[in-house]
Amino acid sequence: MRNWRQAENIRLYIAVGCGAAIGALLRFLSGWVIVAILGANPLWGTSFVNIVGSFIIMFFATLTGPEGRWLVSPALRQFVMGGLCGGLTTFSSMSLDTFLLVLHGNAAFALAYLCGLVFLSLSAAMLGLIAAQRINR
Protein backbone atom coordinates (compact mmCIF):
# COMPACT_ATOMS: atom_id res chain seq x y z
CA MET A 1 0.00 0.00 0.00
CA ARG A 2 2.79 2.40 0.88
CA ASN A 3 4.56 1.93 -2.47
CA TRP A 4 1.32 2.72 -4.31
CA ARG A 5 0.94 5.99 -2.39
CA GLN A 6 4.54 6.91 -3.10
CA ALA A 7 4.03 6.21 -6.80
CA GLU A 8 0.85 8.32 -6.81
CA ASN A 9 2.69 11.17 -5.09
CA ILE A 10 5.48 10.96 -7.65
CA ARG A 11 2.87 11.16 -10.45
CA LEU A 12 1.42 14.29 -8.83
CA TYR A 13 4.87 15.88 -8.48
CA ILE A 14 5.68 15.16 -12.11
CA ALA A 15 2.29 16.48 -13.24
CA VAL A 16 2.71 19.73 -11.30
CA GLY A 17 6.29 20.15 -12.51
CA CYS A 18 5.40 19.58 -16.16
CA GLY A 19 2.39 21.88 -15.92
CA ALA A 20 4.49 24.57 -14.24
CA ALA A 21 7.14 24.36 -16.95
CA ILE A 22 4.51 24.76 -19.67
CA GLY A 23 2.78 27.56 -17.74
CA ALA A 24 6.05 29.46 -17.25
CA LEU A 25 6.89 29.12 -20.93
CA LEU A 26 3.41 30.36 -21.86
CA ARG A 27 3.84 33.28 -19.46
CA PHE A 28 7.15 34.23 -21.05
CA LEU A 29 5.85 33.88 -24.62
CA SER A 30 2.56 35.67 -23.99
CA GLY A 31 4.39 38.50 -22.22
CA TRP A 32 6.71 38.81 -25.17
CA VAL A 33 3.80 38.89 -27.65
CA ILE A 34 1.75 41.36 -25.58
CA VAL A 35 4.71 43.72 -25.21
CA ALA A 36 5.42 43.45 -28.95
CA ILE A 37 1.80 44.37 -29.74
CA LEU A 38 1.02 46.94 -27.04
CA GLY A 39 4.43 48.41 -26.27
CA ALA A 40 7.33 47.96 -23.90
CA ASN A 41 5.34 48.30 -20.66
CA PRO A 42 5.61 44.95 -18.80
CA LEU A 43 2.40 45.70 -16.89
CA TRP A 44 0.41 44.51 -19.92
CA GLY A 45 2.01 41.07 -19.91
CA THR A 46 1.65 40.61 -16.16
CA SER A 47 -1.99 41.70 -16.30
CA PHE A 48 -2.78 39.42 -19.23
CA VAL A 49 -1.41 36.23 -17.69
CA ASN A 50 -3.03 36.86 -14.31
CA ILE A 51 -6.44 37.57 -15.82
CA VAL A 52 -6.32 34.60 -18.21
CA GLY A 53 -4.96 32.31 -15.49
CA SER A 54 -7.78 33.31 -13.14
CA PHE A 55 -10.35 32.37 -15.77
CA ILE A 56 -8.67 29.04 -16.58
CA ILE A 57 -8.26 27.87 -12.98
CA MET A 58 -11.86 28.63 -12.01
CA PHE A 59 -13.23 27.17 -15.25
CA PHE A 60 -11.26 23.95 -14.83
CA ALA A 61 -11.90 23.71 -11.08
CA THR A 62 -15.64 24.02 -11.65
CA LEU A 63 -15.72 21.50 -14.52
CA THR A 64 -13.66 18.93 -12.63
CA GLY A 65 -14.94 19.51 -9.10
CA PRO A 66 -17.47 17.37 -7.21
CA GLU A 67 -20.40 18.87 -9.15
CA GLY A 68 -18.52 18.96 -12.46
CA ARG A 69 -19.12 17.03 -15.66
CA TRP A 70 -15.51 16.14 -16.33
CA LEU A 71 -14.03 13.28 -14.38
CA VAL A 72 -10.27 13.70 -14.43
CA SER A 73 -7.45 12.12 -12.49
CA PRO A 74 -5.90 13.94 -9.55
CA ALA A 75 -2.70 14.19 -11.61
CA LEU A 76 -4.46 15.98 -14.48
CA ARG A 77 -6.23 18.30 -12.07
CA GLN A 78 -2.92 19.19 -10.43
CA PHE A 79 -1.22 19.51 -13.84
CA VAL A 80 -3.71 22.20 -14.89
CA MET A 81 -4.50 23.95 -11.62
CA GLY A 82 -1.30 23.70 -9.60
CA GLY A 83 1.17 23.45 -12.45
CA LEU A 84 -0.07 25.20 -15.58
CA CYS A 85 -2.00 27.98 -13.84
CA GLY A 86 0.62 28.30 -11.11
CA GLY A 87 3.37 28.66 -13.71
CA LEU A 88 1.32 30.97 -15.91
CA THR A 89 0.19 33.47 -13.29
CA THR A 90 2.58 35.69 -11.42
CA PHE A 91 1.79 37.36 -8.12
CA SER A 92 5.47 38.17 -7.60
CA SER A 93 5.73 40.15 -10.85
CA MET A 94 2.57 42.06 -9.94
CA SER A 95 4.13 42.90 -6.56
CA LEU A 96 7.39 43.98 -8.18
CA ASP A 97 5.58 46.10 -10.79
CA THR A 98 3.52 47.78 -8.07
CA PHE A 99 6.52 48.59 -5.89
CA LEU A 100 8.53 49.88 -8.85
CA LEU A 101 5.68 52.24 -9.70
CA VAL A 102 5.65 53.51 -6.10
CA LEU A 103 9.44 53.89 -6.01
CA HIS A 104 9.31 55.94 -9.21
CA GLY A 105 6.75 58.33 -7.75
CA ASN A 106 3.62 56.82 -9.30
CA ALA A 107 1.83 55.75 -6.12
CA ALA A 108 -1.64 56.65 -7.39
CA PHE A 109 -1.10 54.68 -10.60
CA ALA A 110 0.34 51.77 -8.57
CA LEU A 111 -2.81 51.65 -6.45
CA ALA A 112 -5.03 51.84 -9.53
CA TYR A 113 -2.98 49.10 -11.23
CA LEU A 114 -3.14 46.83 -8.20
CA CYS A 115 -6.86 47.33 -7.55
CA GLY A 116 -7.68 47.09 -11.24
CA LEU A 117 -5.74 43.88 -11.72
CA VAL A 118 -7.30 42.24 -8.68
CA PHE A 119 -10.77 43.31 -9.83
CA LEU A 120 -10.21 42.07 -13.40
CA SER A 121 -8.69 38.78 -12.20
CA LEU A 122 -11.62 38.12 -9.87
CA SER A 123 -14.03 39.08 -12.66
CA ALA A 124 -12.30 36.62 -14.99
CA ALA A 125 -12.59 33.92 -12.33
CA MET A 126 -16.30 34.68 -12.01
CA LEU A 127 -16.69 34.38 -15.80
CA GLY A 128 -14.85 31.05 -15.66
CA LEU A 129 -17.25 29.87 -12.97
CA ILE A 130 -20.32 30.96 -14.94
CA ALA A 131 -19.06 29.42 -18.19
CA ALA A 132 -18.26 26.10 -16.51
CA GLN A 133 -21.57 26.03 -14.64
CA ARG A 134 -23.39 26.35 -17.96
CA ILE A 135 -21.46 23.38 -19.31
CA ASN A 136 -22.16 21.41 -16.11
CA ARG A 137 -25.94 21.73 -16.49
Curated annotation (Swiss-Prot):
- Spell out the activity regulation: Na(+) is not transported, but it plays an essential structural role and its presence is essential for fluoride channel function.
Q: One MF term in GO for this entry?
A: metal ion binding
The domain of life is: Bacteria
- GO CC terms of this entry: plasma membrane
Q: Where in the cell is it found?
A: Cell inner membrane
Membrane-crossing segments per the record: 20-40, 43-63, 83-103, 110-130
User: Is Metal-binding among the key words of this record?
Assistant: yes
* Reaction(s) catalysed by this chain's protein: fluoride(in) = fluoride(out)
Binding positions for Na(+)? 86, 89
Q: Family membership, please give it.
A: Belongs to the fluoride channel Fluc/FEX (TC 1.A.43) family.
**What is the protein named?**
Fluoride-specific ion channel FluC 3
Tell me which species this is from. Brucella melitensis biotype 1 (strain ATCC 23456 / CCUG 17765 / NCTC 10094 / 16M)
